[in-house]
Amino acid sequence: VAVIGAGTMGGGIAMNFANAGIPVTMLELKQEALDKGLALIRKNYENSAKKGKLTQEQVETRMALLSGTTTYDDLADVDLVIEAVFEKMEVKKTVFTTLDKVCKPGAILASNTSTLDVNEIAACTSRPQDVIGLHFFSPANVMKLLEVVKAEDTSADVIKTCMKLAKRIKKVAVLVGVCFGFVGNRMIEPY
């Protein structure tokens, strides 16, 4: 698994996979941002250890599952990439265009978008059948809800894989279609 973006959301998403024993490569274009993101994850784990929720050995085991990179080429062999970058369509399209070129055929390309059109993101790739939305709620390492956003061309296998993966990382998955705010944000918006 790879996560694009080592900020608050990207770090929280990566922790879900490390908690489930799944190795994660985190990508940031600047080394300082990558170092900061990995340090924040360690701090979160250390806080859990201080509260007695994890042992120090568990902290180290989970941290050992996390690696970082500043180059997209290091993501060539991953099975799933989750983009967790700034919520602007042009930024996301740039990321997905690059992932389309770099990632192996059949890799699932997922966006953590909370409101943007996953169909539009998928359309900038040559493999829209492999593109899906995986919307984690903040803080991603705590909140249980995961919106699995099926785009128009998302294949049944990709949907099935993402629903199974949600269970493995202890999320409650809700399959939704593309619409403004999906389900969670639509429910919250009136309040």
Language model regions located:
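Short, structured coil segments at secondary-structure junctions
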Residues: 20, 126-127, 169
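Structural motif
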Residues: 4, 27, 69, 84, ...
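NAD(P)+-binding Rossmann beta1-loop-alpha1 motif at the extreme N-terminus of oxidoreductases
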Residues: 1-44, 67, 102
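Internal alpha-helical scaffold of NAD(P)-dependent oxidoreductase catalytic cores
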Residues: 148-179, 189-191
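Rossmann-like NAD(P)-binding element
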Residues: 32-36, 47-109, 115-119, 124, ...
